[in-house]
Amino acid sequence: MKIGVLALQGAVREHLRHIELSGHEGVSVKRVEQLEEIDGLILPGGESTTLRRLMNLYGFKEALVNSDLPMFGTCAGLIVLAQDIVGEEGYLQKLDITVERNSFGRQVDSFEAELDIKGIANDIEAVFIRAPHIEKVNSDNVEILSTVDDKIVAVKEGNYLGVSFHPELTDDYRVTQYFIDHIVAEHKHAAV
């Protein structure tokens, strides 16, 4: 399958590497037209306000709001997918959750953890950098996949996967592989 990484900011190369390690083709997505050429899209981390500005500038918001393309958001990508952000309205509103930005602290408070992620594995390496967490799940359709210190850090809803951390900054590509082999593949199979 062909999986795109929104290449406006963030760890694009690292996500592409994880896609390739998963046995699939990775594509840097820089133009809206490319969305029609891919089976799924990864929204990388970075700074969510900047990411939203760039998505507006290049026309991605409208295209993605109106799309059922499977999407995987990491860190800032999770924030972009959320229905609500504490204190403001969400952006793409694909995951029926409320997120809180920087809830684990500032840059100096960054940390790594080994997570038990439902349906994937109990030893997933995760890097948290100014990470958000999922404050609230707003629907029974959202499946909680993992928590850290009683904070929700990974969820799935339909075609969408969101995590608070940066799986791409480790050598462990199983979260990306799960997105492709389960969420994207199921969507593609259902569309046939």
Curated annotation (Swiss-Prot):
Top-rank lineage group of the source organism: Bacteria
Pathway: Cofactor biosynthesis; pyridoxal 5'-phosphate biosynthesis
Pfam families: SNO
Official protein name in the record: Pyridoxal 5'-phosphate synthase subunit PdxT
Gene Ontology terms: cellular component: cytosol; glutaminase complex
Entry's family note: Belongs to the glutaminase PdxT/SNO family.
InterPro entries for this protein: Class_I_gatase-like, PdxT/SNO, PdxT/SNO_CS
Function description: Catalyzes the hydrolysis of glutamine to glutamate and ammonia as part of the biosynthesis of pyridoxal 5'-phosphate. The resulting ammonia molecule is channeled to the active site of PdxS.
An annotated Gene Ontology molecular function: pyridoxal 5'-phosphate synthase (glutamine hydrolysing) activity
A Gene Ontology BP annotation from the UniProt entry: pyridoxine metabolic process
Active site: 75 (nucleophile), 166 (charge relay system), 168 (charge relay system)
Taxonomic lineage: Bacteria, Bacillati, Bacillota, Bacilli, Bacillales
Keywords linked to the UniProt accession: Glutamine amidotransferase, Hydrolase, Lyase, Pyridoxal phosphate
